[in-house]
């Protein structure tokens, strides 16, 4: 007797959000939602970390985006970073701060997680964080030169004068905190995500 081929369905209870070749399961979407929520909540934790520039603050949302990138790839990490800050913008209207946060995180998370994805070792993670950190540092300095004069009364020459004493040290400390935070929590979280 010939067997009847099974039909593929798009029923809501199949717990899949893609076709056979896709990789976005319901579990992955739920995990993404949780990561975005945690990123959003932590974006409101503002810690002054550099006494010379009390207006520049560190928030742990970058750690969440970096963990997402390491766990699911650069696209997901970037998505978590961008969604976190777009939602933040709905509650605190600060387009300048949001733009700077997105540029900072995307330039860190994308290269770091792309390198780690191709070398899933501690060495790959460290190399990714170093390259991502350098990219983020460069982007933050350049973006400050362009964006800050557009949104504030600070001139380009005043921003340029802040590069060495304020912008580079602050962003280095911020990047190190994000990378160390990710390194400390990534393994336990990745085990929980794969369970």
Model feature map: region roles:
Residues 1-195:
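Loop-helix junctions at membrane interfaces
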């Amino acid at each position: 007797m010939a067997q009847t081929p099974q039909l593929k369905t798009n029923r809501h209870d199949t717990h899949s959000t893609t076709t056979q070749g896709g990789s976005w399961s319901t579990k992955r979407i739920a995990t993404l939602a949780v990561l975005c929520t945690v990123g959003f909540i932590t974006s409101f934790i503002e810690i002054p970390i550099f006494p010379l520039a009390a207006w520049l603050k560190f928030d742990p949302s970058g750690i969440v985006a970096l963990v997402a990138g390491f766990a699911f790839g650069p696209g997901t990490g970037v998505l978590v970073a961008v969604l976190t800050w777009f939602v933040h913008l709905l509650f605190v209207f600060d387009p300048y701060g949001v733009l700077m946060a997105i540029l900072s995180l995307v330039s860190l998370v994308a290269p770091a997680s792309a390198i780690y994805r191709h070398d899933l070792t501690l060495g790959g993670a460290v190399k990714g964080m170093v390259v991502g950190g350098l990219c983020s540092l460069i982007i933050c300095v350049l973006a400050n030169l362009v964006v800050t004069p557009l949104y504030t009364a600070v001139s380009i020459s005043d921003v340029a004068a802040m590069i060495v004493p304020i912008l580079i040290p602050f962003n280095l400390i911020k990047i190190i905190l994000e990378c160390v935070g990710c390194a400390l929590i990534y393994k336990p979280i990745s085990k929980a995500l794969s369970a």
